[in-house]
């Protein structure tokens, strides 16, 4: 299930240049919902995003003591390869990544995005000022995506991203990602270590 939802946006391409981007390295929870005519997927993932090294990690089987569980997928765009790792079973599969790193996970608001206006979460002095944008993309398979993203106004931290896809496999679809507990920087860089059994 991690792979299904995480691969959905892996082939998107956007206009070069950006209006804004979040910090180059961050950790966050992602609540993902994907719906099309045949499938509904809801999942809570944890993402570790390393823009400095063009890689990110997604895991879905955490517990309260561990942010990264025993299964994870590491997308390494410098090496042009991804690893699906199950540390408990000591298994690993590799597959090529598609597209460019800058286009993955839709974390940057691309140049040319239409401003939909300010939004406010909370109230009074504790409110979070945010900005909402809309833009269109086309993936490598030719499907079209209308993306609406809401980010914090001061530092472009993603809050929610909603993507409507037309012409894709399985028909039209809706993909939403809500971000929670966003933390700039990387708490533990060793989460990107590739175990020896991946290279066997």
Curated annotation (Swiss-Prot):
InterPro entries on file: Ependymin (IPR001299)
Tissue note: Component of the acid-soluble and acid-insoluble organic matrix of prismatic shell layers (at protein level). Expressed discontinuously in the anterior zone of the outer fold of the mantle where its expression correlates with shell pigmentation.
PANTHER family: MAMMALIAN EPENDYMIN-RELATED PROTEIN 1 (PTHR10697), RICIN B LECTIN DOMAIN-CONTAINING PROTEIN (PTHR10697:SF13)
A single MF term (Gene Ontology): calcium ion binding
Protein name per its UniProtKB record: Ependymin-related protein 1
Pfam family, one: Ependymin
Tagged with keyword Transmembrane helix: no
One GO-annotated biological process of the protein: cell-matrix adhesion
Lyase in keyword set: no
Similarity comment text for this entry: Belongs to the ependymin family.
Keywords linked to the UniProt accession: Glycoprotein, Secreted, Signal
A Gene Ontology term for the protein's cellular component: extracellular region
Localization (cell): Secreted
Glycosylation site residues: 36, 124, 136
Highest rank taxon of the organism: Eukaryota
Signal peptide range in chain numbering: 1-17
């Amino acid at each position: 299930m991690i792979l299904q939802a995480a691969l959905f946006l892996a082939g998107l391409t956007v206009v070069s240049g950006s209006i804004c981007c979040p910090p180059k390295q961050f950790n966050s929870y992602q609540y993902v919902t994907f719906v099309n005519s045949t499938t509904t997927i809801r999942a809570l993932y944890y993402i570790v995003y390393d823009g400095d090294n063009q890689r990110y990690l997604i895991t879905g089987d955490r517990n309260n003591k561990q942010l990264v569980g025993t299964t994870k997928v590491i997308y390494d765009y410098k090496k042009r390869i991804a690893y699906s790792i199950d540390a408990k079973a000591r298994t690993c599969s590799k597959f090529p990544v598609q597209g460019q790193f800058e286009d993955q996970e839709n974390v940057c608001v691309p140049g040319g995005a239409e401003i939909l206006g300010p939004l406010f979460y909370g109230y009074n002095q504790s409110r979070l000022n945010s900005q909402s944008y809309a833009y269109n993309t086309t993936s490598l398979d030719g499907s079209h995506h209308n993306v609406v993203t809401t980010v914090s106004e001061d530092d472009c931290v993603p809050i929610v991203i909603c993507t409507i896809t037309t012409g894709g496999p399985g028909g039209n679809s809706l993909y939403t990602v809500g971000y929670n507990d966003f933390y700039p920087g990387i708490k533990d860089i060793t989460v990107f270590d590739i175990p020896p059994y991946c290279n066997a």
